[in-house]
Amino acid sequence: MVLPNFKENLEKYAKLLVTNGINVQPGHTVALSIDVEQAELAHLLVKEAYALGAAEVIVQWSDDTINRERFLHAEMNRIEEVPAYKKAEMEYLLEKKASRLGVRSSDPDAFNGVAPERLSAHAKAIGAAFKPMQVATQSNKVSWTVAAAAGKEWAKKVFPNASSDEEAVDLLWNQIFKTCRVYEKDPVRAWKEHADRLDAKARILNEAQFSALHYTAPGTDLTLGLPKNHVWESAGAINAQGESFLPNMPTEEVFTAPDFRRAYGYVSSTKPLSYNGNIIEGIKVTFKDGEIVDITADQGEKVMKNLVFNNNGARALGECALVPDSSPISQSGITFFNTLFDENASNHLAIGAAYATSVEGGADMTEEELKAAGLNRSDVHVDFIIGSNQMNIDGIHHDGSRVPIFRNGDWVI
């Protein structure tokens, strides 16, 4: 199988990521994070960014094979250390208010067999060192977009019955192009219409200002409090310079932050989570007074426990996102083993940091003010999927009255 018009569609995709995604403007600095396997796409993205007037495009290459060898064999003190030159680059990008474009294509099993303690130590070090970048991103001080490209090992994981590696890659590219509306006659207009539909749902929820949400489904009975003056966001965002951008491509979600002090009950995952090169399945999380008091998993439990119990702020939630079961990604019936796609197939929660923009005025608040407003602060932000066609969600008003939001996995407001 050879995907028809692949080069033409890859060019359209690159243009979408640079224009609709990070929305490059003349004089912008762009930081592109991408795998070495995706050099063809990287070249197109760099070309498009400069064509729109970018002042500089900095490419940050990654390689799963090299990273795996490092995690397996490097001395532990090196794994726990973030070199000064990487911190200096981060400071440079912050100074330039660089737009960040991250293209994900990693093998979901890249670090399978690496000791979870080594992966956890590295993630903790990176989280602490790059905290200023995380804060700038999560408060939309800069434009940022997360997208995907069809890596060979990832494609083989998603399509194990493909007749060849080439066919698996083609099948995955086809899904990426489809969900990112590349095949539409006018992709830019298609994205605007899609964003408008999501914005309409966000407006309804913002006007309601529910006190809490109640989730029920097989394996789930969870109540999440919502902060005062919380803000539901959808596809588009605005950076500190007043420029629009799309944080995720694809996206199907409407999201906010729960009050991290008010989570009660239990919730079960409905799709695998790919985290730190490991697949985690069958997650069940129990909350009391906002805090995770127990977490189990059928596969990858040790990795999950390391995430939750060894990272500051990881015992509470930072995001709750609503995605209907009727979304195109869900209806494809494909498990992508990639959070960007799987989270846009279904309702999900995030362990760790909340986005500052999830409360009114949050982008200008200090860390202490955000925490006082009910927004969790952490060095990590990890989404896991909880939705299904059996999930019901109610909005609870301050007087205790309830309004159905989801029934059988779909919007009813």
Swiss-Prot record:
Superkingdom, taxonomy of origin: Bacteria
Binding site for a divalent metal cation 2: E319, E343, H381, D383
Gene3D superfamilies in alphabetical order: Thermophilic metalloprotease (M29)
Record: residues binding a divalent metal cation 1: E253, E319, E343, H348
pH effect on activity, per entry: Optimum pH is 7.5-8.5.
Keyword flag Metal-binding: yes
Keywords: Aminopeptidase, Hydrolase, Metal-binding, Metalloprotease, Protease
EC annotation from Swiss-Prot or TrEMBL: 3.4.11.-
Cofactor(s) required, per the database record: Co(2+); Zn(2+); Mg(2+)
Transmembrane segments: none
Disulphide-bridged cysteine pairs: none
Reported temperature dependence: Optimum temperature is 55 degrees Celsius.
One function term, GO molecular function aspect: metal ion binding
InterPro entries given in the database record: M29_Exopeptidase, M29_N-terminal, Peptidase_M29
Details of cofactor binding: Binds 2 divalent metal cations per subunit. Can use cobalt, zinc, and possibly also magnesium ions.
Protein family membership: Belongs to the peptidase M29 family.
PANTHER family, sorted: AMINOPEPTIDASE, AMINOPEPTIDASE AMPS
General function of this protein: Exhibits a high specificity towards peptides possessing arginine or aromatic amino acids at the N-terminus. Could be involved both in bacterial growth by supplying amino acids.
Subunit relationships: Monomer.
The protein, known as: Aminopeptidase PepS
Organism: Streptococcus thermophilus
Gene: pepS
